[in-house]
């Protein structure tokens, strides 16, 4: 896919994600209207400059809680989904009022993971974004919490925003949060935590021994770990990603103009293809294949297909063309791919030579378990 909208070198596609902690007052859970108004002004100004802008907004559950007088985020799924339905309408009304004042049209786009799992629906979502951006509209995106089920949830809007940025092949992804940048530890509990301004590769984080923590705020779901995971998805698509303070939306324009505010993640110089990004991040893996060292080396170092001889163990139940994770013996994921055999058949041929497949299974199947065209390193 190529997101060509007669763009010039001076205009960009920009995805901005704002979390519940930035949208609401921490003490009451009520909307932080001044922050939202400044965000609307900033995004409208970016649009007026010819940029294509997408806003991924959390807050439906938090706003619903405030509207209903609930003092804490509900844990029961049915109640949370009901509260999200209340909050989403209120949230969109606020956005629509603010953007209308600025004469900027917006659109509500609610997504579930299943919208990205099926390739035809994935492409349909892409086409919808393409048309909205061509019309000069700012799509306001959220997970459809009211209907999403656990098995097909994004889990947090950091992941959703990265998948949207990957889908539309954005130039920038801004993850607005309640801290000003990434630190070597949580600065709220470790006063001497070291700020990190630039990450040239995700592997750098291990070298820096970043202790990001997974906990989110009281009202949100995304901690710093989810933002790093989101950055991994985005930079693989060639999207420059920035973590910065959500209370100061005007910093978005300053960053685009070259100021080094927040933490910047440099994009990969050679982005993964759109189809392989769909395999790696759009699909939900339903099984795991544990590989021997020879197969791992062939895949990682030589870009080879996976053969049955390299599979040591099969976990999960799946059918041909389902997505699976490829793991080392310790369970660390190294790749994902679309498998050519069901889990039942693969159990029978794992560890065997490809030429033995017809004798074992009674039919002539593919020589590969996963062809390299359907395999992507993660």
Curated annotation (Swiss-Prot):
UniProt keyword annotation of Secreted present: no
Catalytic EC class: transferase
Binding site for substrate: 58, 145, 157
Keywords (A to Z) from UniProt: Amino-acid biosynthesis, ATP-binding, Cytoplasm, Kinase, Nucleotide-binding, Proline biosynthesis, Transferase
Residues noted as binding ATP in the record, renumbered to the chain: 17, 177-178, 221-227
Single Gene Ontology BP annotation: L-proline biosynthetic process
SMART domains per UniProt: PUA
GO CC annotation: cytosol
Coiled-coil intervals: none
Domain PUA: 286-364
PANTHER family: GLUTAMATE 5-KINASE
Name of the protein in question: Glutamate 5-kinase
Organism of this sequence: Nostoc sp. (strain PCC 7120 / SAG 25.82 / UTEX 2576)
């Amino acid at each position: 896919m190529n997101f060509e909208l007669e763009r010039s070198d001076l205009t960009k596609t920009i995805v901005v994600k704002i979390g519940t902690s930035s949208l609401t007052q921490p003490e009451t859970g009520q909307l932080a209207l001044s922050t939202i108004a400044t965000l609307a002004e900033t995004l409208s100004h970016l649009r007026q400059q010819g940029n294509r802008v997408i806003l991924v907004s959390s807050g439906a559950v938090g706003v619903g809680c405030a509207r209903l007088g609930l003092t804490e985020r509900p844990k029961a799924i049915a109640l949370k989904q009901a509260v999200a339905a209340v909050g989403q309408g209120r949230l969109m009304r606020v956005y629509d009022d603010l953007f209308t004042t600025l004469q900027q049209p917006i659109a509500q786009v609610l997504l579930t993971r299943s919208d990205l799992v099926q390739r035809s629906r994935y492409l349909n979502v892409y086409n919808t974004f393409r048309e909205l951006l061509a019309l000069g509209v700012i799509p306001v995106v959220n997970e459809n919490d009211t209907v999403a089920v656990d098995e097909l949830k994004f889990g947090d809007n950091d992941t959703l925003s990265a998948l949207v940025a990957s889908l539309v092949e954005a130039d920038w992804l801004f993850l607005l949060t309640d801290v000003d940048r990434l630190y070597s530890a949580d600065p709220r509990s470790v006063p001497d935590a070291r700020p990190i301004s630039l990450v040239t590769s995700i592997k750098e984080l291990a070298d820096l021994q970043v202790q990001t923590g997974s906990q989110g705020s009281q009202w949100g779901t995304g901690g710093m770990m989810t933002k790093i995971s989101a950055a991994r998805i985005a930079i693989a698509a060639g999207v420059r990603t920035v973590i910065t303070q959500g209370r100061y939306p005007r910093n978005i324009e300053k960053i685009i103009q070259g100021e080094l505010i927040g933490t910047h993640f440099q994009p990969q110089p050679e982005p993964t293809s759109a189809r392989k990004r769909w395999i790696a991040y759009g699909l939900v893996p339903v099984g795991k294949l544990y590989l021997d060292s020879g197969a791992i080396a062939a895949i990682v170092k030589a870009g080879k297909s996976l053969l049955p001889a390299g599979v040591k163990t099969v976990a999960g139940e799946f059918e041909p063309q389902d997505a699976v994770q490829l793991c080392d013996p310790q369970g660390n994921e190294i790749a994902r791919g679309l498998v050519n055999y069901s889990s039942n058949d693969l159990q029978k041929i794992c560890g065997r030579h490809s030429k033995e497949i017809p004798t074992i299974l009674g039919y002539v199947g593919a020589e590969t378990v996963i062809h390299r065209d359907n395999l992507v390193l993660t």
